């Protein structure tokens, strides 16, 4: 098992969390929702990978790597990362990885390139009629400091803020 990477500096994170990546404020707790990829915010992506690995290991999972980042996070047309940022504490509360059905790419055999592709057979009918109206969500996490069992009132709205970002 690899050691988890050190936290990314708050200055680097703030420099990448620019207005053009901000979706909006949350409905509760005055946090901010951002959408990033490794292409436009590589340091934020590394911090997401670090926080995911910490959260997943604490729940008995994890990749065993220094951070939880895979090919779906780093491919040419990557999954997007929706995160909740606490501007007061200058830290990420949690996040989701997602891909809209309209953004799905296909391999040379015509199969959709999705994190769940190995789990399902997608029929031609599904791909043509339903996939464009879907969203694949995955790798959701709430940082340990904001999990309600550990954080008390600090974590009260963390999950709500994440769902707020999903709409």
Functional labels for PLM-detected ranges:
Residues 103-167:
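Acyl-donor binding region in acyl/amide transferases
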Residues 72-83, 106:
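A short helix-loop-beta-strand connector motif used in the catalytic cores of GNAT acetyltransferases and
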Residues 77-79, 88, 92-93, 130-132, ...:
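Short, well-ordered loop/turn elements at secondary-structure boundaries
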Residues 2-39:
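Conserved N-terminal entry element of GNAT/NAT acetyltransferase domains
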Residues 63, 100, 144:
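Residues that line or immediately flank small-molecule/substrate-binding pockets and catalytic motifs
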Residues 16-23, 68-69, 120-128:
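Intrinsically disordered, low-complexity boundary segments flanking structured domains
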Residues 96-102:
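Short beta->alpha transition motifs characteristic of CBS
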Residues 25-70, 81-94:
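Short amphipathic alpha-helix that is part of the acyltransferase structural core
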């Amino acid at each position: 098992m690899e050691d988890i990477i050190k936290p990314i500096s708050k200055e680097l994170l703030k420099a990448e969390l620019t207005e053009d990546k901000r979706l909006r404020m949350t409905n509760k707790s005055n946090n901010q929702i951002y959408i990033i990829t490794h292409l436009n915010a590589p340091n934020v992506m590394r911090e997401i990978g670090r926080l995911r690995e910490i959260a997943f290991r604490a729940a008995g999972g994890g990749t065993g790597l220094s951070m939880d980042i895979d090919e779906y996070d780093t491919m040419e047309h990557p999954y997007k990362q929706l995160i909740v940022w606490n501007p007061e504490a200058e830290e990420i509360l949690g996040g989701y990885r997602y891909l809209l059905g309209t953004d799905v790419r296909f391999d040379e055999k015509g199969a959709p390139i999705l994190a769940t592709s190995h789990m399902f057979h997608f029929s031609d009918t599904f791909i043509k009629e339903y996939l464009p109206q879907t969203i694949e969500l995955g790798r959701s996490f709430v940082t340990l400091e904001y999990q309600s069992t550990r954080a008390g009132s600090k974590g009260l709205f963390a999950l709500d803020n994440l769902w707020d970002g999903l709409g």
